[in-house]
Amino acid sequence: MAKQEIKYYNLPDKYWHRIHFVRPRFKSNIENVLLYMAGECCRIPDCSCEDYNKKYLNAIRMFPGNIDMAEKTLQNWRTEIPALFGFYVEDKEADITRTSKMATFLYENQDLTQFFRLFLMSFQFPGGHMKPQDLKDIIYLNIRFKPAKTIIQVLLAGNELLSSKNSVKEMSLSAEETTYCIFNDVRVTSGQISPKQVAKTILDNRKNQIKYYNPADPHTKSLTGASRTKGDMTRYAGDILDYMELADL
């Protein structure tokens, strides 16, 4: 019997732009880390950027298991938490750093579900979490993208399509589908394609047994020229889906 040819989803170069953002090193323990760091930040008064940074780094070092953490990893934690979750606001011109309302909310309410809802509601592209060199491409491509909002819209549109076919199934999304059909398609992230069109594409791809990750696809190549793994390709969409689960969305 002849081997069945694998059919891959093909997104033309002109529509491809890989969405990426800061990924915390502590993601496997994110709930405990965020609750701890929110509390520690709220104990630091408004002070100079240097003083706040010292107190903040010391708080990271005192988190259980971090006492012998390498300096580079400590610095990664230091930049990742404010970049992604905005736990403090640094004004270098005035030389003052203040703990943010997001950190205060989490510390006072101890409500991770609501915290992640607030986070996802405001997390967008372009956004303050991005590096300047990445912002240039996002703006040039006219990308205006709120990941969680778009995912919810696609799920709702998918439910309508399934219901119209008398299906009792509910729409779902895998990290691969979210990566290739939503995150990395400029037509979606710039609002040129409706959520209903995205949902239809995904459902059609399932029906036609279309695969997504293809190590031979030039889009999978890293800067070194090696192919990224499936996990590398889908990690950002996977993160947002995980955060949505924590937000009970």
Indicate residue ranges for each PLM-predicted region:
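Donor-sugar nucleotide-binding helix/loop cap in glycosyltransferases
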Residues: A2-L249
